[in-house]
Amino acid sequence: MINNNMMNSQYMFDYPAINIDVRCHRLLSSVSYVAYNKFHTHDVSTYEHCEIPLEKLRLGFGRRNSLADFYSLGELPASWGPACYFSSVKPMMYTFQGMASDLSRFDLTSFSRKGLPNVLKALSWPLGIPDCEIFSICSDRFVRGLQTRDQLMSYILRMGDSHSLDECIVQAHKKILQEARRLGLSDEHYNGYDLFREIGSLVCLRLINAEPFDTASSGEALDVRTVIRSYRASDPSTGLTEYGNSLWTPIHSHVDENDESSSDSDF
């Protein structure tokens, strides 16, 4: 006899165990995939090797231009992203990926040097406090697979405010679109195909907009500024689709003239 409960379920190999910690903007929250190997009561969506039980949304089929085309109807794709042979969301190329990879060699201490308050502010999106993990995820050296599922879904979990991963994915993409629009960019370039590279692209653009307002001119802080500056357009008006509106509300840096980070150069 067929179990009627299985008619509306899907086999799941590994289940995402969620630990919510509300301290530090949920930055201590985490996802750990554990062996499951049985039918789950919900349908399952797959993104970047990560199985996601659909607790809040339904399973959507077919290929659409954007992730929003699914969740606007209360759905998530059956599978999508760069790891898919045939993604349900249209593949997309992203800007500033070389910059993200170049910045992956710095840790948060490097970005926290004196004279870099605007750079640090730029890194405070999307998690609410400075974080540079996205550069490692977007690095050329980062290979997504079963071994990276916990890290990737933990990042998505921290971007949202839900206990359900499917809902956190929707919240993450909505946050991406909101920031892209704020920076004068088009939704079509941030369609949810690769959430992490979209986040990396936007963080890089925030850094490009923020860096001119900082004053650090020596040591590791100067190295950070040099990398960022190397990706700034000489004439941003010629690359509006990439550089947006250059919007930034600066934090004015007050550096002591005897401090090693104080500037007496034209950098």
From Swiss-Prot:
Transmembrane segments: none
InterPro entries tied to this protein: NSs-like, RVFV_non-structural
Domain of life: Viruses
Annotated family: Belongs to the phlebovirus NS-S protein family.
Name of the protein in question: Non-structural protein NS-S
Organism: Sandfly fever sicilian virus (SFS)
Gene name as annotated: NSS
